């Protein structure tokens, strides 16, 4: 785990240097942005909506029984923005796009395509990693923001349908409870999670040796490692900003 973390840090440094020196093409970044976030947008929004709906079902009647139904909107908004949207979106993108990144680079490694890039005097880590890391860092926070809006809307619809909470009271509660700081931190989480998904999965794919069987094993390991690193990062961010 420690040696793998060191490889990730080294690959991140090479990728940043590759980007700073202007060797990464915009077309490559846009293609990776579409593959990483756009293709995962629908499933991310569905997860956000369903998650908010489940939370609304669980808390609405409890709040109603205690006469605190006016706080339903704020509670759902805070939970969605602080934790559910960034975490679930990152897990969805990691499961879909992260494993695809790992499988693609692992396949290139075992079929000697990476060696072919080296013969052209191109830095393979920068060439393969930089567009993916930049695309994930930019687009994952965007998906998180959209998921937050969808989740809050889902909570509104469910609370209105279950306890007949007026939308105005729901929205007023959201405005009272929500702060710009929470939104900024959720976007920071999206940025960090995006970088980790691309970096960890690409590194795992790049370290693959052997044949087709090893590609499959590497892809599975990439999904596990990216999830572990995201959970650790989530804990540290919460520890820094909310303790």
For each feature predicted by the language model, list its residue ranges.
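Hydrophobic alpha-helical transmembrane segments of multi-pass membrane transport proteins
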Residues: 72-115, 200
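Short cytoplasmic-facing helical segments at TM-TM junctions of multi-pass membrane proteins
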Residues: 105-130, 212-215
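Short, membrane-interfacial amphipathic segments enriched in basic
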Residues: 1-27, 204-205, 209
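Selective transmembrane-helix segments that form parts of the transport pathway or gating/packing helices
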Residues: 37, 41, 45, 84, ...
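Final/C-terminal transmembrane alpha-helix of multipass membrane proteins
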Residues: 215, 221-238
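Membrane-interfacial helix-loop-helix connectors in multipass membrane proteins
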Residues: 58-81, 148-191, 195, 199-219, ...
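Hydrophobic alpha-helical transmembrane segments that constitute the membrane-spanning cores
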Residues: 47-51, 93, 130-159, 192, ...
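Active-site cofactor/substrate anionic-group-binding motifs, chiefly glycine-
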Residues: 37-88, 92
